[in-house]
Amino acid sequence: MTSPASAPAASNTWPGLISALINGDDLAVGNTEWAMNTIMAGEATPAQIAGFLVALRAKGETVEELAGLVEAMVQHANPIDISGEKLDIVGTGGDRLNTVNISTMAALVAAGAGAKVVKHGNRAASSASGSADVLEALGVRLDLSIEQVARNAEEAGITFCFAQVFHPSFRHTAVPRRELAVPTAFNFLGPMTNPAHVQASAVGVANARMAPLVAGVLARRGSRGLVFRGDDGLDELTPTGPSTVWEFRNGTVKEQVFTPADLGIRPSTVADLRGGDAAANAAVVREILDGKTGPVRDAVLLNAAAGLVSIDLHAEGSLEQRMRTAFARAAESVDSGKAAEVLAKWTALSQS
């Protein structure tokens, strides 16, 4: 493939962009930003959207191409104003391993440890229970005004930006995505398009090729944090063995390997992390916040620690050293009851 600098500039038309992609040419940021703006405005046909997505996926997305999609999507989002430093802990999904809602539990634990968490998510796509599904099962209302969503963050230390509320223009992609029924670039945009413009993100990406690209886009946008992928295929920091981690800050990305055994965590299996429907996964959330030990707790604390490391990237030390300190903070959040208190307060606020 050729780079935008060496390739002829593709014209901002559907035939121009799709032809360039078929030829193996990388698009410029402005090209994909135009494409997404056109889609978000409802001015692209399902055939044009599908052709663009398939051609882009077949060529292989670049950081610049994803950055253009993200920029346009953020421009079309409903804005929300939440004060201070904010953190998102989120996975792209798509690992098809049907685990419990690890990132949702990790978000509660990180909030209990003092982080202001603004989680951006949706209903399940490839599993039985997405973050929105399990939060509803826990009693957190999602049919809130934007002002109420912001209030939850300010008063409870955590909130949830429901993707379909904050990105209504994304509805124009529904038909071609459903009919294609294969992953495309759009499956990876959620963690990069938090409408609260969070400063820090801990992002699990199951797709090994896409993970460093997500880190690259977030770095390009001035964010900081960690992108990770378990060697077992999980879109989480996994307790089953090593994970590859891409640490991004100050516009740069550094790849490294994290091994949970270095923190004294006993190896487990993906089967130990399997979940069920929203009601079953909500019961697991309550068990973990009540202090139940085992592989699920290990996974939750690891991912909460990743979030705490992400928002505190100025701290000194190796990734292992910083994870060790953050893991202890996450454990204290659960064992002191602070994480459970966060959920109780959030639920009550959302119902008031």
From Swiss-Prot:
Highest taxon in the source lineage: Bacteria
Annotated positions binding anthranilate 1: 91, 122
Substrates-to-products reaction catalysed: N-(5-phospho-beta-D-ribosyl)anthranilate + diphosphate = 5-phospho-alpha-D-ribose 1-diphosphate + anthranilate
Binding residues annotated for Mg(2+) 2, in chain numbering: 235-236
Alphabetized InterPro entries for the sequence: Anthranilate_Pribosyl_Tfrase, Glycosyl_Trfase_fam3, Glycosyl_Trfase_fam3_N_dom, Glycosyl_Trfase_fam3_N_dom_sf, Nuc_phospho_transferase
Residues involved in 5-phospho-alpha-D-ribose 1-diphosphate binding: 91, 94-95, 99, 101-104, 119-127, 131
Cofactors: Mg(2+)
GO cellular component terms, semicolon-separated: cytosol
GO molecular function, one term: anthranilate phosphoribosyltransferase activity
One GO process term, biological-process aspect: L-tryptophan biosynthetic process
Pathway entry: Amino-acid biosynthesis; L-tryptophan biosynthesis; L-tryptophan from chorismate: step 2/5
Cofactor binding note from Swiss-Prot or TrEMBL: Binds 2 magnesium ions per monomer.
Binding locations of Mg(2+) 1: 103, 236
The enzyme's E.C. designation: 2.4.2.18
Amino-acid positions noted as binding anthranilate 2 in the UniProt annotation, renumbered to this chain: 177
PANTHER family assigned to the protein according to its UniProt record, in alphabetical order: ANTHRANILATE PHOSPHORIBOSYLTRANSFERASE (PTHR43285:SF2)
Protein role: Catalyzes the transfer of the phosphoribosyl group of 5-phosphorylribose-1-pyrophosphate (PRPP) to anthranilate to yield N-(5'-phosphoribosyl)-anthranilate (PRA).
Subunit structure: Homodimer.
Family, per entry: Belongs to the anthranilate phosphoribosyltransferase family.
NCBIfam families per the UniProt record, alphabetical: trpD
Protein name per UniProt: Anthranilate phosphoribosyltransferase
Provenance organism: Paenarthrobacter aurescens (strain TC1)
Lineage: Bacteria, Bacillati, Actinomycetota, Actinomycetes, Micrococcales
